[in-house]
From Swiss-Prot:
<dbReference type="Pfam" id="PF07118">
    <property type="entry name" value="DUF1374"/>
</dbReference>
<dbReference type="InterPro" id="IPR009804">
    <property type="entry name" value="SIFV_Orf14"/>
</dbReference>
<protein>
    <recommendedName>
        <fullName>Uncharacterized protein 14</fullName>
    </recommendedName>
</protein>
Length: 112
């Protein structure tokens, strides 16, 4: 992938990822390459355990959550440096001690 392609990434619907490790590898890549914005949607929700979900989140600095009709949106903030913060937003439902992830978005913002 070319560097100029990394400024903004919006995926096609992804339907071949079946494990949390696939998403974890993608998130690591996006963080390391300092992608300014991305969105990943799943045709079939990615099923993860609560432990795998926590591992995907890593060490965040703050969080916010809202739920409606069984769907939850969690937003996590990570301090990147003095001027920039990184945000991750997960849209999912929880059922039978599993988390079904529909979408993940990430973006960088200047701190206010």
């Amino acid at each position: 992938m070319e560097k100029q392609d990394l400024e903004k990434i919006e995926s096609d619907i992804i339907n071949d990822w079946t494990e949390a490790d696939d998403l974890d590898d993608a998130l690591d890549f996006l963080f390391m390459e300092k992608v300014s914005e991305f969105k990943i949607k799943f045709k079939d929700p990615l099923k993860v355990t609560e432990e795998e979900y926590r591992e995907l989140l890593g060490n965040y600095d703050s969080s916010n959550s809202v739920s409606s009709n069984g769907i939850t949106i969690d937003q996590y903030t990570y301090d990147e440096d003095d001027d920039i913060m990184y945000k991750l937003e997960f849209t999912y439902r929880k059922e039978d001690n599993k988390i079904y992830i529909y979408e993940v978005q990430g973006w960088r913002e200047k701190k206010k």
